[in-house]
Amino acid sequence: MDAPSRSHLASPILVANYRSLPSFMYRDSLPEAAVSPQLLALNTRLLETLEQDLAWFNSSDALEQLSGKTYYGSNLPFALAYSGHQFGGWSPVLGDGRAHVLGQLKTAADELIDVQLKGSGATPFSRGGDGRATLGAVIREYLLSEAMAGLNISTTGSLAVIATGEDVWRNGAYPGAILVRTAKSHLRVGSFQYAAVHQGPEAVKTLADFALAQYYPELSHDENPYQALLAQVIKGQAELVAQWMLVGFIHGVMNTDNSSITGETIDYGPCAFMDEFNPNKVFSSIDSQGRYAWGNQGAIAQWNMARLGETLLPLLDSDEAKALEIAQAQLGDFNRLFAEHFYQGMARKLSLDASDPELIPFVDSTLQLMTNTRVDFCQFFNALTEYHSTHREQDAGLVALFSTEAFPSLSSTPAQLLQDWLSQWQAKACDSQAALAAMIKANPKFIARNHKVEAAISAAEQNNDYSLFLDMARVLANPYVLAEQDKHYQDAPTPDQRVKQTFCGT
């Protein structure tokens, strides 16, 4: 890759407001220009949502900038600095090792949206890495982030996939690519940790004031704005992680440097959606202890929020004991908020009354049924929705999911366990049209099935065939709409298709 040149052609990408921060929070860094860039995917849905000029993003000028070949005027790209706890271990200096912030887009409502290149070459934070990304890793993030957007779960956006025309060496040669990513913010818990450990409380105050002004201006005039900021980030993370779990999503690397202060899902590495249900399920090849398993994600998010609270202590109160008391009170709210979002979400998925005092034990017993029978997560809720929508007359699809032989550890067959559970559910299920509509809306027809994602990646990497990738992106953008030709995306993997591990491929 070559160094980019400066362009004086008009661009909608503005100078990023991060440059108002102290310079220790970022480093100027030029992308390594792609040798032979090719636009493989442009997310017109996202561009329309952000109210951007489609013509410009389809132009050769856009391809030059988004592939790192040029930058506009004095708008020098940069890499953000941050620290992080990675799998619980402290890393004082991390930062964007393979990403460059180009600037920001402005929406019609004057909201600023970050534009970042991922896989665009080495930065001062690369720590010996090449800063590049494989096409497979870029396709994975594009598909998974589109799936989350389609599910109405807060996420960074994938604006474009650009092939670089060069191979990237990992455990072999793979085609290289750049992901153009958008976000409300790229500030993380790790950003506050970096400010605290390297510059101290005044730097944390500067960063917190920036976050309040840019993302939560309504909190700036609060009696204690820093307490309000902590409370808002906690609230956002509690809701976000509950939403992940309600669709069987496992992030895989919930480090503090991957915990957004604006409540967005960020950094899709070894993430995946579950097929058969297992609360202890992990996919990440490096999560050998199961730290970030599906069922641990709420507790880990709270742990990350505690690390944010530690950085804000000097701002919460001048009295250290009182500051700690304030932080602990806010962190104590996490479990309530998380449980509220999770169990109310499960009530919608099961067409139950959220105010039922027996809701929590019944949901827990449902999850135990799913664990014992290893039923497919998404298919179970879809089959139950179909059964409920036919006035509980057509149960063939539901029964078929539990038609396997008895497991040695169970005293009853899966079919018997289902019937026992169904009798309890039928006594509790709400029959109103509103409840059924909420149930349908809570249970997507499609998730980003791992074996389907891998098939799309394989076709692209091995045969330069992007049709599977683009078709899957289309389906995932509308996961509640089932067309006949798309039904195969609902299929669970056969034993030989099952993806057992995922990797941080970028």
Curated annotation (Swiss-Prot):
Nucleotidyltransferase involved in the post-translational modification of proteins. It can catalyze the addition of adenosine monophosphate (AMP) or uridine monophosphate (UMP) to a protein, resulting in modifications known as AMPylation and UMPylation. It comes from the Bacteria. This is Protein nucleotidyltransferase YdiU. The lineage of its organism: Bacteria, Pseudomonadati, Pseudomonadota, Gammaproteobacteria, Alteromonadales. Mg(2+) binds at N258, D267. Disulfide bonds: none annotated. InterPro entries: SelO. The gene is ydiU. Pfam families: SelO. Belongs to the SELO family.
